[in-house]
C-alpha cells in the first residue's frame, strides 16, 4: 500500500483504507479529457468518482482517480415546468435544497441522498416512492476518447431499478458532465412510504415532505462524517407475486410493494433483520444497529472485512428466504469496477 501515492480514505464515505497512483480534480470538460488521455498514454486505468458515496474499495486502485467537479445550476421555465441544467459535480442534496428555496417542488422525496448529481442517473437514485427517472429530462455525456458531448434523452437512459445505460453501454470511457431536471408546475405529493403516509395530500407542502424525509433518514441512517458507510448496501429484491405471497403468508407484517409489472418489491433491510443480524460484526465491519440495510465501518474496517460481512449476510438471507440479495454499492478493484454479485458468490 505505501508505495502508492494518493490515499482514497477521505474520498469514499466508507472511509476505507485504499490508495491510487494519482488523484485529479476536474472542474472542466477539458481537464477530464486531458487526464483521460494522459492515463491512456501511460496504460493506466481511470476511475471516475463523484463523492465516493456508493463505492467499496476492495483493493488499491492501480491508476488515476478522476474527481468530477463540474459545477453550476441554471434554470428556465415554461408554462408547464421548470427546467434545471445541473453540473455533474454539484451535491445532490444541495440541489434539492436549491429547488425548494426557489419554489420548484418535485425533488423533496429525494432529500439527503448522498453523492453528486452526476452519479444520480447511473444508479437511477430513488427514495420514498420517487426515482430520478421521473424528473430526469436528459443527461449530457462526454465521450472522453473523442472529446465529444452528446445529449441522452431520459428515454434513452434505459432507467431501471438502480440501473441505467450508464452502467453498461456508456460505462468506461464516458463521463456525465451535466443532468437536465424537469419539475412539473402541476405538483402532486408522493406519500406512499414511511411516515409520509400519515400526511394529508390536500394540505401537505413540498417543504413538509422534505422535512419529514430528512427526519426519517437521520433517524435511521448513520452520518458518514461520523461513521463510515455507503448508505443502503443491498438493493431491495424484486420477486414474483407468487414468492411474495408465500413470504407474506408466513410473515404477515413483511413490507412489500406491488410493482407496475405485477412483480413485488421486498425490503432488504427487513429480510436481514429477520436473520437477527443487526449489530453483527466481522473484523471492523458491522451491520448498523438501527438500519440493517446499512453496513458500517465500525472500527478501522478494510474492504475485505466488508466483503466477508456482505457475503455472510447474503448466505443467511438466502438460507432463510431463498432470496439472494444483490449489492447496490459498486465494488472497485485494482483495475476498476468488478461484478459485485460474482465477487460475493
UniProtKB/Swiss-Prot annotation:
EC category name: oxidoreductase
Coiled coil feature spans: none
Record-listed E.C. numbers: 1.3.1.98
A single cellular component GO annotation: cytosol
Gene3D superfamilies recorded: 3.30.465.10, UDP-N-acetylenolpyruvoylglucosamine reductase, C-terminal domain, Uridine Diphospho-n-acetylenolpyruvylglucosamine Reductase, domain 2
GO molecular function per UniProt: FAD binding; UDP-N-acetylmuramate dehydrogenase activity
Known pathway: Cell wall biogenesis; peptidoglycan biosynthesis
Subcellular compartments: Cytoplasm
One GO BP annotation of this record: cell wall organization
Keyword Cell wall biogenesis/degradation: yes
Alphabetical list of InterPro entries matching this protein: FAD-bd_PCMH (IPR016166), FAD-bd_PCMH-like_sf (IPR036318), FAD-bd_PCMH_sub1 (IPR016167), FAD-bd_PCMH_sub2 (IPR016169), MurB (IPR003170), MurB_C (IPR011601), MurB_C_sf (IPR036635), Oxid_FAD_bind_N (IPR006094)
Record: active site: 162, 232, 328
Keywords: Cell cycle, Cell division, Cell shape, Cell wall biogenesis/degradation, Cytoplasm, FAD, Flavoprotein, NADP, Oxidoreductase, Peptidoglycan synthesis
Names of the cofactor(s): FAD
TM helices/strands, residue ranges: none
Every FAD-binding PCMH-type domain range: 16-186
Catalytic activity from the UniProt record: UDP-N-acetyl-alpha-D-muramate + NADP(+) = UDP-N-acetyl-3-O-(1-carboxyvinyl)-alpha-D-glucosamine + NADPH + H(+)
Main location: cytoplasm
Entry similarity comment: Belongs to the MurB family.
HAMAP family: MurB
Xref: NCBIfam families: murB, PRK00046.1
UniProt-recorded name of the protein: UDP-N-acetylenolpyruvoylglucosamine reductase
Phylogenetic lineage: Bacteria, Pseudomonadati, Pseudomonadota, Gammaproteobacteria, Enterobacterales
Gene: murB
Amino acid at each position: 500500500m505505501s508505495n502508492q501515492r494518493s490515499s482514497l480514505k477521505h474520498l469514499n464515505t466508507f472511509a476505507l483504507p485504499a490508495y491510487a497512483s494519482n488523484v485529479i480534480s476536474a472542474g472542466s470538460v477539458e481537464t477530464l479529457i486531458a487526464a483521460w488521455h494522459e492515463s491512456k498514454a501511460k496504460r493506466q486505468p481511470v476511475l471516475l468518482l463523484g463523492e465516493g458515496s456508493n463505492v467499496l474499495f476492495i483493493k488499491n486502485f492501480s491508476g488515476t482517480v478522476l474527481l468530477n467537479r463540474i459545477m453550476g445550476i441554471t434554470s428556465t421555465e415554461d408554462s408547464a415546468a421548470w427546467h434545471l441544467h445541473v453540473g455533474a459535480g454539484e451535491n445532490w442534496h444541495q440541489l434539492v435544497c436549491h429547488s425548494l428555496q426557489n419554489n420548484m417542488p418535485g425533488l423533496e422525496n429525494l432529500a439527503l441522498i448522498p453523492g453528486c448529481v452526476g452519479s444520480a442517473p447511473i444508479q437511477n437514485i430513488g427514495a420514498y416512492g420517487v426515482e430520478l427517472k421521473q424528473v430526469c429530462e436528459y443527461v449530457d455525456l462526454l465521450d472522453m476518447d473523442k472529446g465529444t458531448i452528446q445529449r441522452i434523452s431520459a428515454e434513452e437512459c434505459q432507467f431501471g431499478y438502480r440501473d441505467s445505460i450508464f452502467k453498461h453501454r456508456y460505462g468506461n470511457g464516458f463521463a456525465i458532465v451535466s443532468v437536465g431536471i424537469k419539475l412539473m408546475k402541476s405538483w402532486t405529493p408522493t406519500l406512499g412510504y414511511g411516515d409520509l403516509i400519515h400526511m394529508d395530500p390536500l394540505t401537505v407542502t413540498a417543504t413538509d415532505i422534505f422535512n419529514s424525509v430528512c427526519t426519517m433518514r437521520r433517524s435511521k441512517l448513520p452520518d458518514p462524517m461520523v461513521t463510515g458507510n455507503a448508505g443502503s448496501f443491498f438493493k431491495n429484491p424484486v420477486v414474483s407475486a407468487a414468492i411474495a405471497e408465500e413470504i407474506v403468508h408466513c410473515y404477515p407484517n413483511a413490507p412489500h410493494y406491488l410493482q407496475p409489472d405485477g412483480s413485488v418489491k421486498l425490503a432488504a433491510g427487513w429480510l436481514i433483520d429477520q436473520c437477527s443480524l443487526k449489530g453483527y460484526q466481522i473484523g471492523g465491519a458491522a451491520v448498523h444497529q438501527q438500519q440493517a440495510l446499512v453496513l458500517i465501518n465500525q472500527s478501522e474496517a478494510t474492504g475485505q472485512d466488508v466483503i466477508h460481512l456482505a457475503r455472510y449476510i447474503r448466505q443467511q438471507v438466502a438460507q432463510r428466504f431463498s432470496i439472494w440479495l444483490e449489492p447496490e454499492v459498486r465494488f472497485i478493484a485494482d483495475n476498476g469496477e468488478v461484478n459485485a454479485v460474482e465477487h460475493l458468490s
